[in-house]
Amino acid sequence: MRRTIAVSPAPTLEPQPPWNRQRRLLLLSPLLALPAARAASNLVATPAQMLGPFYPLRPDAAAGNDLTTVDGKGRAQGRALRIVGRVTDTTGRALPGLLVEIWQTNAHGRYHHPHDDSAAPLDPNFRGYGRATTGMDGAYRFATIMPVAYPGRTPHVHCRLSRGERELLVTQMYLPDATAANARDGLFMSLREAA
């Protein structure tokens, strides 16, 4: 039986110290265009999006959920934050044991990937890729940095969910406060048009 995946509620960004503000920033999956007041029993499936060219060539099984350091040797540049979310099916039932992978650019707009030929500098302390397994309640969390825009794209974080060798969903998460950049991003706008 095939299950449709919903990320509910949409993942949130929580600024980490020293930027610990009262306000929680919302990092939305493609659910951005959907009404936030939907009941858990009436969830809408998170739309799939492209994997993109910078998924790791060899995903690091030991990467863990902290993208802000590589082997504990210093901290990544950029504004530290946490991505916190929960994966359910469209009835609201938690999906435990899923592998959640994320990857994104560093604070300069460059991916940690050999095919990214951007002139932007690399950050030796930013991993660029992380992985976590959903708990019994479908929850996951990541420590990373605020994503930044680069030419042609709004700030975003790529996300892939799988169980074993079976890919269940590839999507992207967006910042609701990046309204001008979001409006210029074709992939983001295609989600709004489809909703």
Q: How would you describe each model-predicted region?
A:
Residues 1-21, 28-36:
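N-terminal secretory signal peptides
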